[in-house]
Each structure stands twice: as C-alpha cells, then as structure tokens.
C-alpha cells in the first residue's frame, strides 16, 4: 500500500480544505513545487495533486503548477484531479508528464466519457468517487447525486480504469480516521484497485487500514495529517512495507 501525499492547489498555493468547503481553507505553502520536494525527499512514491479551482470551474486553473511539479520529477508517478472534463485536458496533462488523471464529476454525469478516455489514454485514467452517506457527490462536492458509489464503481470495471480514489466527504480534512468499513466494502465489490482518501490522522489509521486485510486497497492519500505533523510519510510507508511483505 502506498502512502500518497496530497497537494491541493488553490490560487497557486498549497492549501487544505475541511469537508471540501472552499471557504474553509488553510494555506500551508505558497510554493507547491517546494512542498512536492519535501514529500519526495521524505520518501513518497506517488503524489496526489488536486486543482481545487479547476474542480469548481470545470477546467484547469492551476495547470502550470502541476506541469512544473511533473517536469521536476519525471520518474515519480503523479496523479491529478480537478476540472478534468475533456480529452484535450487529459492529453495536456499526459504530455506534461503526469502519470494519471482523475475523472470525478464527469464520470458521474457522463460515465461513457470514462470508457472513451480509457480507450484514448490506456492505463492513465483513475476515477474519483467522492461520497456522502454512500452517494456520489459532484462539482467540487457542491452537489450530492442519487447514484450509489459501489453501483457506479462496478460500471467502470470493463473500461480499463487504473484505480478508484474513494473519498468520504464527511471525513475529509477532519483527521478523525477514514471510513474503513466502506472503503474495504468497495474494494471487495469491484475488481478495480481502490485508493482510500479522507480523514487519516495518524499511524493508527494506517494500521487500521492494513488490518482491514483488503488486498484491493492499494494506497492511502493523506493531506492535513502530514501538513500538521500528526503523520510522518516515511514512517507510514515503512509500516506499510513491513506489513505487506
């Protein structure tokens, strides 16, 4: 299981939100490239970037920052989400050196777009499913749909999706532990690898994820915990490596 540091981009800065609210953000750095360097130096093996402005506007806004990070670390897998709603945007990021693009809102509203993207960019597409009470949320979490997470995840199995990033909105940024039962249930219900996101606070939460013994969970995204110092990236990754030998 990979420990994946999150770099959320808002107006060119590295921030963290609470429960997806743009008005409730904390700026952790005005130099996201330097922040990426910190996590890489700390031993991370993948980075999770989110263009928060892009998620709300429906098109890339902080793309220059994403490109700068990807070019600085050409051998590091980087995944980017937020505002990815066209093949042109995916092509732009892939050409910039990004390993994976995360399709969120568009995957819910137009599931057929995921299949199209997977055909055009095989191995590059991740679906981001953000949920509240088991139902998928869209548009930067501003809207909650009537679509259930597990039902939608199963729909993408035949498309060639590389992974699903599952985020429980109620947990995100709150550092109260992630929704392990549902994350494990999702991993068990689909053949697509799952990356857990939202709520990780400390090493105990990583251990709890490992204890779930869900082989389909391949990663855990962490944000506020590593910025506020309650979780150390290297220590957490070492725990995962030991447990999964």
Swiss-Prot record:
Gene3D superfamilies: Aldolase class I. One of its GO terms (molecular function) is 1-(5-phosphoribosyl)-5-[(5-phosphoribosylamino)methylideneamino]imidazole-4-carboxamide isomerase activity. InterPro entries: Aldolase_TIM, His_biosynth, HisA_bact_arch, Isoase_HisA-like, Isoase_HisA-like_bact, RibuloseP-bd_barrel. Pfam families: His_biosynth. Disulfide bonds: none annotated. Its EC number is 5.3.1.16. Keywords: Amino-acid biosynthesis, Cytoplasm, Histidine biosynthesis, Isomerase. One of its GO terms (cellular component) is cytoplasm. It is found in: Cytoplasm. The keyword Isomerase applies. It catalyses: 1-(5-phospho-beta-D-ribosyl)-5-[(5-phospho-beta-D-ribosylamino)methylideneamino]imidazole-4-carboxamide = 5-[(5-phospho-1-deoxy-D-ribulos-1-ylimino)methylamino]-1-(5-phospho-beta-D-ribosyl)imidazole-4-carboxamide. Coiled coil: none annotated. It comes from the Bacteria. Pathway: Amino-acid biosynthesis; L-histidine biosynthesis; L-histidine from 5-phospho-alpha-D-ribose 1-diphosphate: step 4/9. The active site is at 8 (proton acceptor), 130 (proton donor). GO terms for biological process: L-histidine biosynthetic process; L-tryptophan biosynthetic process. SUPFAM superfamilies: Ribulose-phoshate binding barrel. Belongs to the HisA/HisF family. This is 1-(5-phosphoribosyl)-5-[(5-phosphoribosylamino)methylideneamino] imidazole-4-carboxamide isomerase.
């Amino acid at each position: 299981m990979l420990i994946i540091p999150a770099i959320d981009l808002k107006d060119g800065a590295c921030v963290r939100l609470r429960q997806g609210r743009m008005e409730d953000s904390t700026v952790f750095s005005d130099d996201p490239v330097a922040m990426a360097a910190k996590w890489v130096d700390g031993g991370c093996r993948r980075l999770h970037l989110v263009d928060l402005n892009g998620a709300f506007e429906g098109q890339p806004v902080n793309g220059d920052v994403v490109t700068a990070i990807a070019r600085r670390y050409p051998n590091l897998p980087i995944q980017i989400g937020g505002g990815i709603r066209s093949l042109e945007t995916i092509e732009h990021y892939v050409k910039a050196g990004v390993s994976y693009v995360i399709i969120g809102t568009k995957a819910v509203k137009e599931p057929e777009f995921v299949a199209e993207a997977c055909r055009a960019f095989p191995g590059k597409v991740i679906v981001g499913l953000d949920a509240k009470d088991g139902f998928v949320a869209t548009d930067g979490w501003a809207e909650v749909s009537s679509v259930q997470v597990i039902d939608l995840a199963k729909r993408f199995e035949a498309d060639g999706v590389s992974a699903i990033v599952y985020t429980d909105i109620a947990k995100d940024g709150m550092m109260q532990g992630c929704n392990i039962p549902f994350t494990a249930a999702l991993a068990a219900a689909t053949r697509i690898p799952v990356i857990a996101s939202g709520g990780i606070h400390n090493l105990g939460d990583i251990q709890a994820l490992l204890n779930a013994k869900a082989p389909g969970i391949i990663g855990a995204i962490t944000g506020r915990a590593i910025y506020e110092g309650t979780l150390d990236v290297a220590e957490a990754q070492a725990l995962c490596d030991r447990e999964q030998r």
